[in-house]
């Protein structure tokens, strides 16, 4: 991370994962101007939330991540989490990933640890959206 101040991605990731809306998150931004995050929603929870709220949103992963209501709700979760961190550690932008991260999908190791390089590769278009 460019500035002298170093950030510890796992601290921010764990804080974000306290949200019921967020299943997985990977903080990115090494050698970039700001920290950002790739977020995999808790799709089941989000679908229930959509029903509770009566939003007219298809319960497909793609429709959920594309919806303004879901994007805004996740922004609130990120904003709340950011309050716990210094300015330089705060997540400035995020992208929602369309599929659950899994061992089979190559996102996770058999012990459920994130394969950061694989996730970066899979979602490189999303990373480009963030930093361009």
PLM region spans:
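A short N-terminal helical cap/helix-turn-helix that marks the beginning
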Residues: 89, 123-132
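Hydrophobic/anchoring residues in structured secondary elements
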Residues: 27, 93-96
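AMP-binding/adenylate-forming catalytic core of the ANL superfamily
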Residues: 2-87, 100, 105
């Amino acid at each position: 991370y460019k500035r002298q101040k170093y950030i510890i991605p796992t601290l921010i990731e764990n804080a974000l994962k306290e949200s019921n809306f967020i299943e997985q998150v990977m903080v990115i931004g090494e050698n970039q101007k700001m920290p950002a995050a790739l977020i995999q929603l808790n799709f089941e929870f989000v679908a229930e939330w959509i029903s509770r709220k009566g939003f007219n949103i298809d319960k497909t992963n793609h429709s959920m991540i594309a919806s303004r209501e879901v994007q805004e709700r996740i922004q609130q979760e990120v904003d709340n989490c950011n309050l716990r961190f210094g300015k330089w550690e705060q997540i400035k932008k995020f992208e929602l990933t369309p599929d659950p991260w899994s061992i089979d999908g190559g996102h996770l190791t058999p012990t459920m640890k994130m394969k950061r390089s694989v996730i970066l590769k899979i979602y490189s278009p999303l990373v480009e959206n963030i930093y361009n």
